Structures are given as C-alpha cells and as structure tokens.
C-alpha cells in the first residue's frame, strides 16, 4: 500500500517561494490502477517524481508497504519495488534488449525464454526484438513497451508512468493500453499513471485530480469519470481524445 501524508514541495525563485505541491495526502491500495489527471502545470509529474525520489519532498511522508521512503534515494526506492517510466524513455546504443532486461532483473543469467516472456507480455514479438539494440531504430511506442518490459522484469510492486501516451502513434497507443490492461488484470502490481488520455483514464479503478499543487477530487472511476466528461462537454477539458 502507498501512503502519502501531508506532502509538500517548494522551490525558491526570483519571485519568491513557489508551492509546487501543497499538503497532499492520499492512500492507494495494493494492485489498484490509479490515474492522476488534471490541467498542465498542476503538479502531477512533480508528485510522481516525488514518490520515486527524483525530487525531494520539502515536508511530509511517503510510505510504501509500511516503510518510510521519504529520505531514501531513487536506487533504494527501486530496491523496495518502486519503478518509474519516463515520458521519453532513454535509448542505449550498443545495448541489446535482452541485455537491458537482464540488467533490469538483476539476474545476469536471465534466460532467452524469460526475456521472451517479458516481451510477449507487452505485446512485442520476442524474436523480432530480443537481439535489437535499444537505439534510434526503434519507434517511441516500441521503446516505451520495452521500458515496461524492464519494469516487469524488476517485478516491481508499484509502477509509475508519466504520460506514457506522449509522442507515440495511434497503433502504438492501442498496444500500450492493451499492455496496461494486461498488467492490471494479473493483479501483481499497483499502477499509478499520469495521463490526460481518456482511454487510459477509463481503464482506472480510481481517479485523482490534481490542480494548483493540490488534490481537488479523488474517487472511484465510475464517480469521477462522468464529471470529467461533463467538463469536456462544457468546453473546459484538459483531456486528449487521441494521439498522432
């Protein structure tokens, strides 16, 4: 279970102190699919990065499975089963997909069959990818699904993804949503996804709306999603209905 208690993050600027996150508290039960959404600049990505340890909390606590993570490094949080998928995953020229999966798993003896299972689970034909380099020859959607495969190889209990729909085509996006649906159906991990995408939001068990550094609404999808759609109809949507 993920617990966030009174989390705040402030930065100093020429204009003075800026409150990026303001006293955020929430609880996410194990194996839930939760989407954080809201207007741009509202603090969604900063919240995700704070959970992973990529930005330091000014105050508050981050507790994962009963352990206080607040002062732990990114590496230490990863060792506790927290993983983070970036908007633009890194590429590694000269590094094969199978080697990346072995590194992610912490097992340099990871078998070809095990690598293929991870690739298959994210909708990639293993034979076409296992010996390819993770370089610019791969599309954005392919790299994102390979990144998800590495997170699966880590056997992460909490998977955080920051706008995974960014920069991918329609076909890749359909495969990506299938992958998230599959992960959730297996009930092996908690999914926390930052997204404006209606089709991703519609997969969630729960929706958290963040604006101006605060949680403005939180609840089951069946309760919150109709409100989001109503706002869309009213012409004040921050959602996107498709990808390029």
Regions found by a protein language model. Give the residues of each.
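ABC ATPase NBD coupling module
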Residues: 68-83, 228
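The feature captures the beta-strand-to-loop junction immediately N-terminal to the Walker
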Residues: 37-39
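Helix-to-loop junction immediately C-terminal to a conserved catalytic motif
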Residues: 52
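Conserved ABC transporter NBD signature motif
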Residues: 60-67, 114
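Q-loop/switch helix immediately C-terminal to the Walker
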Residues: 88, 94-111
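ABC ATPase C-loop
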Residues: 151-152
């Amino acid at each position: 279970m993920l617990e966030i208690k009174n989390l705040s993050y402030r930065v100093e600027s020429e204009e003075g102190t800026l409150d990026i996150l303001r006293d955020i508290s929430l609880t996410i039960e194990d194996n839930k699919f939760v989407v954080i959404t809201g207007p741009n600049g509202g603090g969604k990505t900063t919240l995700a990065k704070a959970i992973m340890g990529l930005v330091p909390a000014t105050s508050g606590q981050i507790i994962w499975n009963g352990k206080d993570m607040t002062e732990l490094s990114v590496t230490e949080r990863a060792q506790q089963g927290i993983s983070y998928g970036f908007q633009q995953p890194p590429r590694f020229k000269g590094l094969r997909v199978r080697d990346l999966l072995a590194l992610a798993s912490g097992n340099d003896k990871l078998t070809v069959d095990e690598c293929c299972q991870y690739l298959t689970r994210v909708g990639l034909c293993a034979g076409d990818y296992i010996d390819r380099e993770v370089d610019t020859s791969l599309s954005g959607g392919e790299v994102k699904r390979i990144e998800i495969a590495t997170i699966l190889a880590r056997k992460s209990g909490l998977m955080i993804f920051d706008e995974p729909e960014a920069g991918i085509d329609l076909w890749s996006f359909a495969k990506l949503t299938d992958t998230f649906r599959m992960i959730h159906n297996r009930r092996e991990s908690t999914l926390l996804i930052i997204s404006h995408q209606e089709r991703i939001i519609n997969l969630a068990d729960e929706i958290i709306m963040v604006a101006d550094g605060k949680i403005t609404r939180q609840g089951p999808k069946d309760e919150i999603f109709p409100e989001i759609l109503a706002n869309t109809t009213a012409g004040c949507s921050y959602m996107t209905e498709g990808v390029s």
